[in-house]
Swiss-Prot record, chain A:
GO biological process: epithelial cell differentiation; glutathione derivative biosynthetic process; glutathione metabolic process; linoleic acid metabolic process; prostaglandin metabolic process; response to nutrient levels; response to xenobiotic stimulus; xenobiotic catabolic process
Name of the protein described by the UniProt record: Glutathione S-transferase alpha-1
Start and end residues of each GST N-terminal domain: 3-83
PROSITE patterns (UniProt xref): GST_CTER, GST_NTER
Domain GST C-terminal: 85-208
Key words, A-Z: Acetylation, Cytoplasm, Isomerase, Lipid metabolism, Oxidoreductase, Peroxidase, Transferase
Swiss-Prot record, chain B:
Family of the protein in this entry: Belongs to the GST superfamily. Alpha family.
PROSITE patterns according to UniProt: GST_CTER, GST_NTER
Name the record gives this protein: Glutathione S-transferase alpha-2
Residues modified as N6-succinyllysine: K4
Cross-referenced SUPFAM superfamilies: GST C-terminal domain-like (SSF47616), Thioredoxin-like (SSF52833)
Organism: Rattus norvegicus (Rat)
Residue stretches making up the GST C-terminal domain: 85-208
Length: 222, 222
């Protein structure tokens, strides 16, 4: 059977949001099955649907794919968003990993223990401003093109846009000294599929607030 | 210029060892420039050689590739150890990510604060025995083949062998109830390139003891 991919995850961004973004940018419609209780998760495990007892899991082309990177790589390859040869893929992979590292750092802030929050927030801001954003500003400056790799849209442009939106939510002033990244953000945001995903009513997920996290923590005991 | 890949990292396993393993299994000779002082690391950064100011970094085919997964993907593609099509690659990626997750968990034990060590060791043992090894035993059982994916050697067989050797060092009893994994370990270990890498005098790195870690911690302030 083929048909739409089915995404299994919580009703939250977490480690699924980059997959939603990539599918949306590729113009692929998808269904979501939300895990709303520990029993839902237990059932997925018991039925042998989760290779390592974890989500994200995506049903696609007859497979039950787990692991964020495996899912992203498959979608990027299938929809030709992964460069034209292995050298372009190497750049795309290197940039993607940097983006995932910083995204993870920022995401972790919402679930980090209160006594560590200040130090971790300061570190995340420092890394954003002094390590990651300068690296990507430099890439754009080096070739002067509209996209990061190969002068056309690839997965990494979508990953970077997603990150820039999180950085903006986190502390918009962090973007001030990166004119090329700001232009990149508007440019990618205006691509038709992306524009659609950015509009209200799409399957994009909103940030969770402290109260929602408390509730999720009680239900899923993390 | 081409020539041998040059690996930049500390004289330790860390996040470079899986790259050493993959190159060795592919029969590729490589050079290592070991980082022996904070000044060595500072120089690499200052010269603009590290995209995100981090190692591992590998000079290969004119690129200065950072990020473990980007490096592994490039080597696996170049030396045809990445499956025959995108569905095989999806399995290889999913399995590889599970292996990297458990490897990271075991590696982190040596540098974790003493007061957390007991709990983290127990968790790592539990995950090894009840999550990861059963998942791979099941894959081997499901198809009865010698290799994990596509009935021939791929990167993921090398990653799994490396993990099984770490598990054995960690607590050999964890392997007892997995006969197919034990047979897999002997089988992959006897492949000529792998056998050579397993012999003393190769570029494989030994486990560090507590004293070496203390010294590294002082020098590199982690």
């Amino acid at each position: 059977m083929s048909g739409k991919p089915v995404l299994h995850y919580f009703n939250a961004r977490g480690r699924m949001e980059c997959i939603r973004w990539l599918l949306a940018a590729a113009g692929v419609e998808f269904d979501e099955k939300f895990i709303q209780s520990p029993e839902d998760l237990e059932k997925l495990k018991k039925d042998g649907n989760l290779m390592f007892d974890q989500v994200p899991m995506v049903e696609i082309d007859g497979m039950k794919l787990a692991q964020t990177r495996a899912i992203l790589n498959y979608i990027a390859t299938k929809y030709d968003l992964y460069g034209k040869d292995m050298k372009e893929r190497a750049l795309i992979d290197m940039y993607t990993e940097g983006i995932l590292d910083l995204t993870e750092m920022i995401m972790q802030l919402v679930i980090c223990p209160p006594d560590q929050k200040e130090a971790k927030t300061a570190l995340a801001k420092d890394r954003t401003k002094n390590r990651y954003l300068p690296a990507f500003e430099k890439v754009l400056k080096s070739h002067g093109q509209d996209y990061l790799v190969g002068n056309r849209l690839t997965r990494v442009d979508i990953h970077l846009l997603e990150l820039l939106l999180y950085v903006e939510e986190f502390d918009a002033s962090l973007l001030t000294s990166f004119p090329l990244l700001k232009a990149f953000k508007s440019r990618i945001s205006s691509l038709p599929n992306v524009k659609k995903f950015l509009q209200p009513g799409s399957q994009r997920k909103l940030p969770v607030d402290a109260k929602q996290i408390e509730e999720a923590r009680k239900i899923f005991k993390f």
